[in-house]
Amino acid sequence: VLLAGIHAETAMEEPTMLLRGKGINYDTGFFPGGRSSRESFDPDVVRRELQIIADDLHCTAVRISGGVPARLTVAADHAAAAGLQVWFAPFPCELTTAQLLPYFVDCAERAEDLRVRGADVVLVIGCELSLFAAGFIPGQDADARIANLSSPNPQLWATLGEVFGRMNAFLAETAATVRKQFGGRLTYASGTWEQIDWTPFDIVAVDAYRDAGNAANYRQELRGHFAHGKPVVATEFGCCTYRGAADRGGMGWTIIDNNAEPPRLNGDYQRDEGEQVTYLRELLEIFEQEGVDSAFWFTFASYDLPYRPGPRDDLDMAAYGVVRVLEQGHGSAYPDMGWEPKESFHALAAAYTG
């Protein structure tokens, strides 16, 4: 992640994009720690947002992510109708391996139905399962597992080889099973700490956040993924909307105090939309230079983190979205939508043009 101090409020000339897939994540709702990331799911809003992603953000691909297969199907249909390549990405939370296999089979059948109707579909069988599934890294839920992995626990780290051995066996079994239902390309959205055997997959996919801890070696880490001889894709990259968020990368959201009612920020932070813009431009340049096939900004909207005027109450500071979600009413840029574009919206659109 990165040290972003430049505020890009003025337009910069964007380089010609060399990425094959110019993408963004689109959340249909998932349930980490039992919390829903998206309560409301209106198919008409979904259709409109995916058309905006195609027409105004100039994306060529979208990763449709979430925990409810029926929602994934609705959004994927609208994405395909908008002309986007669909990365059908079920994101289950707290399921055991016994529960995950039939869940992924159901999703594979849904993805195949869309594919045989002419859409370009990639199936992504899960995301960072070591944290979000039950039974790999110890912990009663995703929050506890994230805390365990983030702590200096030598005993836990000593067991990770065995953990990833079991996880790779499960992924291999799942890949073989879903290929009976799905005839397109297959991958898995991995965390950078996960030691994945990519043999069963067609694409190497990594949630490629840069932060202060890996900034010095970020390019080298990225290059390591090409050793498998398969296309490399950044299934997630992004940062939050406050000064210093780039240094926290994929953990920037942890400034929220979820024990407060209602939730609010846990300290004093300075809202900074330029932080996202700098991070976006720097990582896209790296992806182009290193030959990454496709990249998906995380995310279009953080529906559960609305913008509020008070600095401690502005949950959008902890959001990765390129739009700020409004608690009430509609925006002015898109009067039919309940959000306003952020600076990163316009920066992404400019970068993906051409």
Range-by-range predicted roles:
Residues 25, 297-354:
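Aromatic-rich peripheral "rim/lid" segments of glycoside hydrolase catalytic domains that contact
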